[in-house]
C-alpha cells in the first residue's frame, strides 16, 4: 500500500475517535467566539430560515417579538451563523465524499420518517424555548458561564431517558423485514470506481467552499472566518461521527462513556479559551435561568432520541445521503418556528420574568471558573459511576440446583 493510500485509509476513510475530536471542537469553539463575538450555534439560524419561509407567504415575521430578539436582518449569506452553517454542510459533505460514504439511503420503514419529523419538531421547539440546542445551551453554553446551560444539560439527559422509554413502546418499534433473496453486493471494481468519483467530487466541494469563503472575506473578515470555522466544525463532526444523542442515550442503555467524556472534556477546554476571551472584553451570551431552560431541555432530550439525532448528528448524516435526517432537519426548522410564533405567550411566562445568571458575575471571575470546572469534574464522576451499573456482575435469578453425593 502506498503512503497516500495508507494516509487516506487512516484519516479520510476510517472514522476518528470522538474524544479527541470533541476536545478539538471545544478549543475551536472558543477561538470562534473570540474572533467572531458569538458562539457556535445553529438552531437560532434555522429558526430564521423558518421566518424567511413565512415571509414568502405574506407574513411579517420581522415584527414578531422573538425575531426582534434574535434578529432577522439580511439573508443567511449576510449573517455569521448562516455563513458558518453553510460552511458546516460543505465541510461535512467534503469529508463524507473523501471517505466514499455518500449514498442515498432510505429508512427501512416509512414510520421512521414520521418519527423523525415529530422528533425533529419536538427537539427544535425545546431548543428554541431554551434559547439553544446541544451547542448554544450545552456544549458552548456552559463555557459561557450561563447557569441556564447547566439546567438545560441535566434536563436534556433526563429527557433522553424519557425518550428511550417512549422509543421502546411497541408501536414505535420498526418491524424486521427479511427478503426472500439475498441482495447483490457491488463488485470491488465498482466500489473502487465509486470511491475515485467521490474523491474528485470532494475536491470540487472543497474548491467551492474556498471560493465561498473568499467571497465572504470580501464582505468582512468575520464572515470569512465564520465560513472557515464552519468547514472545520462540519469536517470534525462527520469524521468523528459526533452526535450528542448517542452520548445521552447511552447513559441509559449501554453505559458507554467515551462520547460523554469527550463532551465534558471538550467543554472544559472551551472554558479556558472562552474565559480568556471574556476577560479581554468579548461579551458572553447569557440567557434566562427560568422554567424555559428546564422544559426546553426535557423536550429536546425526548425529541433527539425519537428523531435519532441531535443538531450536529442530523447535519452530517444528511450530507451522507441519509434521507431520514433530511426530514429531521425540516422538523427542527418547524419546531423552532413554532416557538417564534407563540413566543409572546411562552416567553412572558417561562423566560422573560427570570434573571440571566452569569457565574462569573455572581461568584467572581476566578470562583466562577473554578465552580464550572468542579461541576464538569462532578459530571465526569457521575458518568463513570453510572457506567459501573452496566459492568457490575448480576446476581443469578435463582440458585443453581445443589448436587448431592449419592449415598454409598
Please report, for each region that a protein language model flagged, where it lies by residue.
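Membrane-interfacial helix-loop segments of redox and metal-homeostasis proteins
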Residues: 1-408
Amino acid at each position: 500500500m502506498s503512503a497516500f493510500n495508507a494516509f487516506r485509509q487512516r484519516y479520510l476513510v476510517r472514522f476518528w475517535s470522538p474524544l479527541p475530536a470533541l476536545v478539538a471542537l471545544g478549543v475551536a469553539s472558543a477561538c470562534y467566539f473570540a474572533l467572531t463575538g458569538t458562539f457556535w450555534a445553529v438552531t437560532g439560524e434555522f429558526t430564521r430560515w423558518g421566518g424567511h419561509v413565512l415571509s414568502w407567504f405574506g407574513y411579517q415575521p420581522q415584527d414578531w417579538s422573538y425575531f426582534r430578539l434574535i434578529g432577522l436582518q439580511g439573508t443567511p449569506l449576510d449573517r455569521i451563523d448562516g455563513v458558518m452553517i453553510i460552511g458546516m454542510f460543505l465541510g461535512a459533505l467534503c469529508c463524507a465524499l473523501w471517505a466514499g460514504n455518500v449514498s442515498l439511503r432510505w429508512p427501512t420503514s416509512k414510520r421512521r420518517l414520521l418519527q423523525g419529523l415529530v422528533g425533529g419538531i419536538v427537539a427544535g421547539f425545546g431548543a428554541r424555548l431554551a434559547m439553544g440546542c446541544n451547542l448554544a445551551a450545552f456544549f458552548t453554553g456552559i463555557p459561557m458561564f450561563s447557569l441556564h446551560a447547566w439546567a438545560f444539560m441535566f434536563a436534556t439527559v433526563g429527557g433522553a431517558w424519557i425518550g428511550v422509554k417512549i422509543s421502546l413502546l411497541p408501536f414505535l418499534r420498526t418491524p424486521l423485514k427479511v427478503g426472500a433473496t439475498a441482495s447483490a453486493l457491488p463488485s470491488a471494481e465498482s466500489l473502487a470506481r465509486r470511491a475515485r468519483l467521490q474523491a474528485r467530487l470532494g475536491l470540487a466541494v472543497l474548491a467551492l467552499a474556498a471560493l465561498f469563503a473568499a467571497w465572504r472575506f470580501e464582505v468582512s473578515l468575520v464572515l470569512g472566518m465564520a465560513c472557515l470555522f464552519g468547514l472545520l466544525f462540519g469536517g470534525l463532526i462527520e469524521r468523528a461521527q459526533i452526535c450528542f444523542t448517542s452520548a445521552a442515550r447511552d447513559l441509559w442503555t449501554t453505559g458507554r462513556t467515551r462520547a460523554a467524556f469527550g463532551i465534558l472534556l471538550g467543554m472544559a477546554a472551551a472554558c479556558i479559551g472562552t474565559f480568556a476571551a471574556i476577560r479581554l472584553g468579548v461579551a458572553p451570551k447569557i440567557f434566562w435561568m427560568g422554567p424555559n431552560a428546564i422544559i426546553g431541555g426535557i423536550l429536546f432530550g425526548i425529541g433527539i432520541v425519537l428523531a435519532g439525532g441531535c443538531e450536529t448528528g442530523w447535519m452530517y448524516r444528511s450530507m451522507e445521503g441519509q434521507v431520514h435526517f433530511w426530514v429531521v432537519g425540516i422538523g427542527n426548522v418547524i419546531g423552532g418556528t413554532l416557538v417564534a410564533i407563540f413566543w409572546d405567550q411562552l416567553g412572558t411566562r417561562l423566560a422573560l420574568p427570570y434573571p440571566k445568571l452569569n457565574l462569573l458575575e455572581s461568584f467572581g471571575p476566578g470562583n466562577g471558573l473554578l465552580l464550572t470546572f468542579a461541576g464538569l469534574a462532578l459530571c465526569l464522576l457521575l458518568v463513570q459511576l453510572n457506567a459501573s451499573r452496566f459492568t457490575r456482575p448480576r446476581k443469578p435469578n435463582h440458585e443453581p440446583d445443589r448436587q448431592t453425593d449419592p449415598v454409598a
